[in-house]
Amino acid sequence: MRRPPTRSKSRCRLLVHGVVAALLLAACTSGPDRDRDEEAVPDDLSPAPAPGERWQPAPGGSWQWQLTGKLDTSVKAAVYDIDGFTTTKEQVAELKAAGRRTICYLSTGAWEDFRPDAGAFPPSMRGEGNGWEGERWLDIRRLAELEPLIAERFDMCRNKGFDAVEPDNMDAYRNKSGFPLTAGDQLNYNRLIVRLAHDRGLSVGLKNDLDQIPELVGDFDFAVNEQCAQYDECGRLTPFIAAGKAVFHVEYELPASRFCPASRELKLSSLEKKYDLGAWRKAC
């Protein structure tokens, strides 16, 4: 992922500590864009999977991505991508009762000191900071140690009733992680993430990592991308669309009018969002 100032983190720092949480909540009071959200929800849902099968999101459906502030369950979107730790089982059930699909957001490539399981990741596994306070890249070569830690997180997603997972920080090899990571290391780790999700009946999305799409499009069930329009990269996501797999896309610095025509042509599920990833959205 690109680093500030050219690009923000894959999500706004999840400021959920004490007073900061209250300030963030106040900052997110502007509701979602209602001009684009008056349509009925379930008509763009992918068909329900048969028992024992995973949900497969199809291209072009509507979605909402909210990681901060009080969860707004009234947004008229077919898919909700929300924080796996802070979202409750009851909130997931409410969304699913209303016909929505739910994606469990987690960081799988970086350590976060504010997560309840932070102490389970040994210090030697934590590398350089990834540009955000309290976060460090993980040594993704240590598959045997990481597997049970990530498996426990995915168990949490499954037990809360999520349909899918969005694993973040999936391109450590392209960053100054503090470890001599290779593209092969990243492929091995990303495929471990896929296996752990699929073993639990969860769909899984490839987050950014554009260079490895040709190798990974067959493994992942959908893609999540930030700012491909700003950096003229959206065409690189078309293998997912060609495979009948959704691409959930967000822009922060471009108005929707700048990227929506191309997004519709490419069948991307695109949003304009603010960097805090609160409830506000403008859908294409």
Regions from the PLM with identified roles:
Residues 5-8, 34-38:
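Compositionally biased, intrinsically disordered low-complexity segments enriched
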Residues 29-32:
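Bacterial signal peptide processing site
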Residues 1-20:
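N-terminal export and membrane-targeting signals
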Residues 18, 37-284:
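Glycan-processing catalytic domains of CAZymes
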Residues 24-27:
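C-terminal motif of bacterial Sec signal peptides marking the signal peptidase cleavage site
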